[in-house]
Amino acid sequence: MLLIPAIDLKDGQCVRLKQGDMDQATVFSEDPAAMARHWVDQGARRLHLVDLNGAFVGKPRNEAAIKAIIAEVGSEIPVQLGGGIRDLNTIERWLDDGLSYVIIGTAAVKNPGFLQDACTAFGGHIIVGLDARDGKVATDGWSKLTGHEVVDLARKYEDYGVESIIYTDIGRDGMLQGINIDATVKLAQSVSIPVIASGGLSSLKDIDHLCAVESEGVEGVICGRAIYSGDLNFREAQDHADKLGAA
């Protein structure tokens, strides 16, 4: 089970939001590259970056911070980025700059043809981000709710060659209420694409639940507020997951 620290970027700073609300941002660091180094030193094997400003405006906005993170740790572990990625040129530029994976969210929902083109051009590097509230997919920085069911969209993407799906339960994001295991497993069982859980991780108990369903196709989890607030020690959590995986 891969535990992936999240670094959410707003105005060049590392922040955490509650339920995607930009007005409820807590600043955890003004040096995102140093934060990236911290997580690598704590044993992270991949990093998850989100350009929050970019997600809302539809184009990259925290480029300096992202490039600084890639320069700091990109040669050591894979780095993935989501937020504001809506065209092939942006994907190519980020991959050339050293990102390992690019996450397509809103654009995948609104323009499936773009996602298909991206998977064809950059096979093995494209992750889809499906963000949902009560089972319905949300777009545009979670500000717009669609009528699409998560599982229906995921099945559609299966033939495109998507590397994995990050499934976020918006209602639990930043709330430390625990992962929505049932919805995550339902999605993982419905498709052959590996699923990464996101939203609500709060304790080693969540890690236990996730490791128990790893064989269903849940390959990892994004770690957010809990590792910043101190509710969860990242190194301890990854070690715990490794021991369960080896058992």
Swiss-Prot record:
This is 1-(5-phosphoribosyl)-5-[(5-phosphoribosylamino)methylideneamino] imidazole-4-carboxamide isomerase. The keyword Amino-acid biosynthesis applies. GO terms for cellular component: cytoplasm. Its main location: cytoplasm. The gene is hisA. The keyword Amino-acid biosynthesis applies. It is found in: Cytoplasm. It comes from Ralstonia nicotianae (strain ATCC BAA-1114 / GMI1000). It catalyses: 1-(5-phospho-beta-D-ribosyl)-5-[(5-phospho-beta-D-ribosylamino)methylideneamino]imidazole-4-carboxamide = 5-[(5-phospho-1-deoxy-D-ribulos-1-ylimino)methylamino]-1-(5-phospho-beta-D-ribosyl)imidazole-4-carboxamide. InterPro entries: Aldolase_TIM, His_biosynth, HisA_bact_arch, Isoase_HisA-like, Isoase_HisA-like_bact, RibuloseP-bd_barrel. Keywords: Amino-acid biosynthesis, Cytoplasm, Histidine biosynthesis, Isomerase.
